[in-house]
């Protein structure tokens, strides 16, 4: 359908007179002038084409124009489908293989389930390996921490013994100094 809308054809009075003269020539001789003949009405209807005038007047509304365009496009698409091997084709369509139609989705679902089971098993193995790794890492950390604490405890015990030794040495030195001072004071 074209984008332009046709302007309704308006006939002037002069055209109507000419049309009436043409219709008068179509009259049969046995019909009187007082009764309008069917030929005359049909001729007027075809010449003036009031149906097209009314239709164009109604189609002035934009919504109706769009609906008319859509209808025209649908008709064209049906024509295209009937001319090709589409749904509207006159040729006999192949019969639907319902067994294949049912088995294909079942096979797809089975394959999907099988793949998901394999993925789940892999995830379980990886999770088990991760748990083992975490446990072994925890054990290693515990051993390292235990070794560090043991080393610190050993160092502190050695330090305490060293300090005790220093304390004993200082007391002995202090006693010697005290005795020496006392001897010096007694000798005088």
UniProtKB/Swiss-Prot annotation:
Induction / repression: Expression is induced in response to alpha factor and regulated by the UME6 transcription factor.
GO-annotated cellular components: condensed nuclear chromosome; peroxisome; synaptonemal complex
Listed Polar residues bias regions: 1-13, 21-31
Keywords: Activator, Meiosis, Transcription, Transcription regulation
Annotated stretches, region: Disordered: 1-31
GO biological process: homologous chromosome pairing at meiosis; homologous recombination; meiotic cell cycle; protein sumoylation; reciprocal meiotic recombination; synaptonemal complex assembly; synaptonemal complex organization
Transmembrane region(s): none
Biological role stated in the UniProt entry: Probable transcriptional activator involved in meiotic prophase and synaptonemal complex (SC) assembly.
Protein's name in the database: Grand meiotic recombination cluster protein 2
Gene symbol of the encoding locus: GMC2
């Amino acid at each position: 359908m074209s984008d332009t809308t046709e302007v309704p054809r308006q006939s002037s009075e002069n055209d109507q007179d000419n049309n009436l003269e043409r219709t008068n020539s179509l009259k049969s001789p046995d019909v009187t002038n007082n009764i309008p003949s069917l030929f005359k009405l049909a001729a007027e209807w075809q010449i003036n084409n009031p149906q097209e005038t009314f239709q164009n007047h109604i189609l002035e509304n934009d919504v109706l124009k769009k609906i008319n365009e859509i209808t025209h496009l649908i008709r064209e698409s049906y024509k295209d489908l009937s001319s090709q091997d589409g749904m509207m084709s006159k040729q006999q369509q192949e019969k639907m293989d319902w067994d294949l139609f049912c088995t294909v989705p079942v096979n797809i679902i089975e394959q999907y389930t099988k793949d998901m089971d394999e993925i789940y098993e892999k995830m379980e193995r990886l999770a088990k390996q991760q748990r083992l790794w975490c446990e072994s890492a925890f054990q290693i950390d515990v051993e390292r921490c235990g070794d560090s604490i043991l080393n610190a405890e050993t160092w502190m015990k050695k330090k305490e013994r060293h300090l005790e030794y220093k304390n004993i040495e200082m007391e002995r030195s202090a006693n010697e100094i005290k005795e020496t001072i006392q001897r010096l004071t007694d000798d005088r």
